[in-house]
Amino acid sequence: MASDNDLFRVLVYDLAAAKGDIVMLPGRGEMIGGSGLAALLFAKYGEVAADALDPGQPIIFAIGPATGYFPLMSKTVAGFKSPYNGFYAESHAGGRSALALRFAGLDALVVVGRAKRPSVLVVGSRRLELLDTHYLWGADVFTTGKLLRKIAAGSSGHRSIMRIGPAGENGIGYACVNVDTYRHFGRLGLGAVMGAKNLKAVVVQGDADLPLPVDKGYAKLFKAIHEQVTSSGMMAKYHDLGTPANVLPLNELKSLPWRNMTATSDPEAAKISGEAFADELLMHNAACSGCPVGCIHIGMVREKFSDAHRFAIHQVAYDHEPNFAAGPMLGVTDPAEVLAINDMADRQGLDIISAGVALAWAVEATTKGL
């Protein structure tokens, strides 16, 4: 008979019934990481023939067995049927999501059904509640996050808020899920799946203790992994300029799409390079919980709100892919404008990569009078 250490501990929550149950599931020695667990759970709870937005389709948030125990293990895997392509999909996000699940005593959360009214699901080791939050429907992701930090109060270090914006509420096929402000479940429409379930947000409260291995071998292994990760040149690159460091090399290789892919390089690439963003707009770095790299780069967008030259400052996370979609794909070479476009898409809960590509087509079509 398998012990609890050999089993996955999964919370399965039915939004329609407003009820959840803990399921102990075998397979820990067979599945690889959060991806393996998410696939296993979709095979158990998913409906292959049903539409992606069918209430019976599950949303799965899963973590791997090393999460919480070793550095870098900071990603949660979301498994779902994609409204974008109609297939099983994975999306990965960090922030505090993975450690929050671990400190809530869970390997995975499975959400099925459709809530009667727009709702927020709050999950913790000692709390399970579905809140009627119809008043948040229509709110952007930043307003939603700000309010939920008060509504579902908890220790911010071990609390994760995964929420959608109007894009998800309206079933946009590439709506994403904002995770703790600066990270996202992007690309394949998880936001639309949450919207179809009347699920505005999931708040995970990591409110339990996490017993660590007591043998000396564990401490030595942890230290060795930490030292290897933090001393590598690749990790230094991600901490310094981040993925925007790729802009100039890609442009030189003629592999940087410009103006809806009508060109593959441009002499103005230096204006939107990683160096330019760092010199002009970078405010600070941030890190996902449990990760020593600190690869999240947060820039600033100034928004004028008074003729007397008064400005509000928005903090906007940036990476190469969002910058490419809101920059060279649109022919935009001002870093401040790139971040402003990123910020507008992010507020609505749109995947900026898909949104930028769609905008690039629209810009070219308009330019050509189509």
Question: How should each PLM-predicted stretch be described?
Answer:
Residues 1-92, 96-370:
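Intrinsically disordered, low-complexity segments enriched in small residues
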